[in-house]
């Protein structure tokens, strides 16, 4: 007499009861697939946790002087590593220097002309 399981669960037959080799092969394939899915899910969750932890970490705020030095030497993400500046960046920096020096010379001559017109300086 068979014992009834609670909640109307049926008694499961064991895989060893089947003699068909194809069923055993299908079972192995299914087991391999589920293991592969589990390992992929673990990797995905680890990657997600890693990205979330990196996103949560606050990056240290650099002082203004350090940011200017990093810009000058072409250091983008590596703070302590000096990288050779590329040609485009060299041209941009050169043009910035020309612009700043031109502005300073213009301001100097502008103030000079203003003082000459006011009569403080003599020509």
From Swiss-Prot:
Renumbered residue ranges of the record's region Disordered: 31-58
One GO BP annotation of this record: protein secretion
Ranges of biased composition (kind: Basic and acidic residues): 31-57
Keywords associated with the record: Membrane, Transmembrane, Transmembrane helix
Location(s) in or outside the cell: Membrane
Transmembrane segments: 91-111
GO MF annotation terms: protein transmembrane transporter activity
One term under GO cellular component: membrane
UniProt keyword Membrane, yes or no: yes
Main location: membrane
Membrane topology field: Single-pass membrane protein
Protein name in the entry: Uncharacterized protein MG055
């Amino acid at each position: 007499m068979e014992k009834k399981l609670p909640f109307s669960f049926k008694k499961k037959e064991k895989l060893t009861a089947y003699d068909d080799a194809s069923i055993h092969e299908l079972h192995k394939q299914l087991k391999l697939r589920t293991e592969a899915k589990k390992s992929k899910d673990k990797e995905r969750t680890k990657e997600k946790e890693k990205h979330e932890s990196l996103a949560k970490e606050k990056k240290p705020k650099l002082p203004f002087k350090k940011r200017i030095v990093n810009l000058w030497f072409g250091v983008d993400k590596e703070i302590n590593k000096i990288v050779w500046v590329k040609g485009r960046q060299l041209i941009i920096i050169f043009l910035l220097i020309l612009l700043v020096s031109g502005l300073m010379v213009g301001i100097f001559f502008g103030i000079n002309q203003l003082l000459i017109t006011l009569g403080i300086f003599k020509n």
